[in-house]
Amino acid sequence: MVRVKICGITNLEDALFSVESGADAVGFVFYSKSKRYVSPEKAREISLNLPPFVFRVGVFVNESLESVLDIAFHAGLNAVQLHGDESVEFCERLNEKIMVIKAVGISEEQDVRRALEYRKFPVLLDTKVSGYGGSGKVFNWSVVLPYRDQFRYLILSGGLNPRNVERAIEMVRPFAVDVSSGVEISPGKKDHNLVREFIKKAKGL
């Protein structure tokens, strides 16, 4: 069964609803320029109130190794998701302390080949945009297909929503899917009906 991560969590209500609806993971964005930014203290508060066995992931962009680790341990994270220009070497050093998920922006086949450089880690494929962060737009999933089996753990993101997630899973066969804006009322506030529907369709329930 495909795993589901609900990202851009900013409040306990949305986090608990996501988990109760079947989400395997929740994501906190620690990139200060994001509309979904949450402070490490707020993330810690939410994290401490979640049930056991829920995966807590923090999103970072070009932070120092020390800063990532400080926030990760303070907020009670299980993994960090790196959306910047972090090198393979940086990821390896960080991975000695906490699980690393490397996000790579995709618009064409050469981007997928670049993502393969990180395949020793779980790799999240997102839609390529100028700057950093999500776009809420879908990329051409077909560019992934020739390389799909070279990724050990492939996480699909970028413009997913309850209307397209079944098709995305059927086509790409990811280990997990990641959604944020596709289940929102406004940035940082989830639409609970959409969250429930997304998880149900992603897991084939």
Swiss-Prot record:
Pathway: Amino-acid biosynthesis; L-tryptophan biosynthesis; L-tryptophan from chorismate: step 3/5. InterPro entries: Aldolase_TIM, PRAI_dom, RibuloseP-bd_barrel, TrpF_fam. The keyword DNA-binding does not apply. Keywords: Amino-acid biosynthesis, Aromatic amino acid biosynthesis, Isomerase, Tryptophan biosynthesis. One of its GO terms (molecular function) is phosphoribosylanthranilate isomerase activity. GO terms for biological process: L-tryptophan biosynthetic process. Its EC number is 5.3.1.24. CDD domains: PRAI. The keyword Amino-acid biosynthesis applies. It is an enzyme of class 5 (isomerase). Pfam families: PRAI. It catalyses: N-(5-phospho-beta-D-ribosyl)anthranilate = 1-(2-carboxyphenylamino)-1-deoxy-D-ribulose 5-phosphate. PANTHER family: N-(5'-PHOSPHORIBOSYL)ANTHRANILATE ISOMERASE. Belongs to the TrpF family. HAMAP family: PRAI. This is N-(5'-phosphoribosyl)anthranilate isomerase.
